[in-house]
């Protein structure tokens, strides 16, 4: 085991604080509408330019091991906030830096670190309560667009695009962000349930131009096993013909004779039909078939339930307003399933998402959830260069995460105002223990840090901005750094998701309180360079070779 270097008390805290400051100072320049970019070297390819706090934090590695430990703890704040809320990473870093700095000063002045920690926790709980009380539910598409605009650094086009996508696929729908090959950024929306299985025979095609099967008001038969003969299905097929509606068969497979018979009937025009293989594999296939059954209001014909094809009636079939099948995909739009059944299934899948520990399973469950809940939207980000596309994609992802958070827990006035106004709630707390009170005061000071930083990045003195806002009694009065004016933040559309503000403070306080209570630090000693290899001795002269 390698030898260790150990630092104690003030020496340890000073080193740690230096690391915290280096990382925080690099991250906090990106905060607010007038925040600057950070250029990051890549081991290969062009450097990356970004305004995303967590991206900057993840790239920082310091040479001094003790400073690096402080920086890595702060990086943990940004990562945790990013995982939970998807945005607010720079705010969390600024808050953490302020709490660690003030905490280190208090410990140096002889205060008890554990009491300070308790004070920090009491104050944070009061702020969280205050934020939850002030949060206003997001109702309209315009409000969603505002959140998206602020989180993408004032890009109204991105805000509008996210609002459009959310309106189309619903709050539960899946929205993904991809890079576009062209200059433009666009939204591509797939409504209904789409899965990656196409028609089993091109003879089913109804639209020759698009090479697709297009059925309106169709019946959907869901069969768990293979369909090899049509004898057992004849009564059902006759009933479908009499009803005059098209039929889509989704089964494990439709084999030889059965497929040939369906194709012949389709070509003769007597039966509008198309057959598709069931999506997925194994247990996941069954679950997806059940999803389709619930979406279309039909029943999955399964041996487990003692159901046979010959006993199937029209009532057991699902219904859909439109079914489109091409060579590779099937889309079911407007299923006739009951809303209550669909909601119950969505709840079931959400519970499974919470329980699973596998990322792969979680991804597949989220796909199923999106298909049931309304659809999938893809935002394709374009730009003139690869560097520009990557920078814009970072902002779109932040904006998307922020709008999701806003839908979950509502919005509060942005620009650091919500935290600044929460000072009133913290100011009301009085504790008999002076050290605990000092911990509360540390948070009181930290609540000003984000708004000060936003102002300073805009070239305005932070203290003046804080003073002016606190003088005004309106809860939504704040500083618009973009125009450098004092405005009503909600009326101007400068809002933050309550979840992002709350998570940023909780994560910052959690890690900072641990850093403040650190008394010793242990790191590996740098290994001495291995001794150089000794030089090779001169070779003796070779004797002459006699012939």
UniProtKB/Swiss-Prot annotation:
Reaction catalysed by this enzyme: ATP + H2O + a folded polypeptide = ADP + phosphate + an unfolded polypeptide
NCBIfam families: GroEL, PRK00013.1, PRK12849.1, PRK12850.1, PRK12851.1
Gene it is expressed from: groEL1
PANTHER family, A to Z: 60 KDA HEAT SHOCK PROTEIN, MITOCHONDRIAL
GO aspect biological process, one term: protein refolding
Function: Together with its co-chaperonin GroES, plays an essential role in assisting protein folding. The GroEL-GroES system forms a nano-cage that allows encapsulation of the non-native substrate proteins and provides a physical environment optimized to promote and accelerate protein folding.
Quaternary organization: Forms a cylinder of 14 subunits composed of two heptameric rings stacked back-to-back. Interacts with the co-chaperonin GroES.
Family: Belongs to the chaperonin (HSP60) family.
Enzyme class name: isomerase
Keywords: ATP-binding, Chaperone, Cytoplasm, Isomerase, Nucleotide-binding
Protein name (record): Chaperonin GroEL 1
This protein's GO CC annotations: cytoplasm
InterPro entries assigned to the protein according to its UniProt record, in alphabetical order: Chaperonin_Cpn60_CS, Cpn60/GroEL, Cpn60/GroEL/TCP-1, GroEL-like_apical_dom_sf, GROEL-like_equatorial_sf, TCP-1-like_intermed_sf
A Pfam family recorded for this sequence: Cpn60_TCP1
HAMAP family, alphabetized: CH60
The EC number(s) this enzyme carries: 5.6.1.7
Residues noted as binding ATP in the record, renumbered to the chain: 30-33, 51, 87-91, 415, 496
Signal peptide: none
Gene Ontology molecular function: ATP binding; ATP-dependent protein folding chaperone; isomerase activity; unfolded protein binding
Source organism of this protein record: Rhodopseudomonas palustris (strain BisA53)
Subcellular location: Cytoplasm
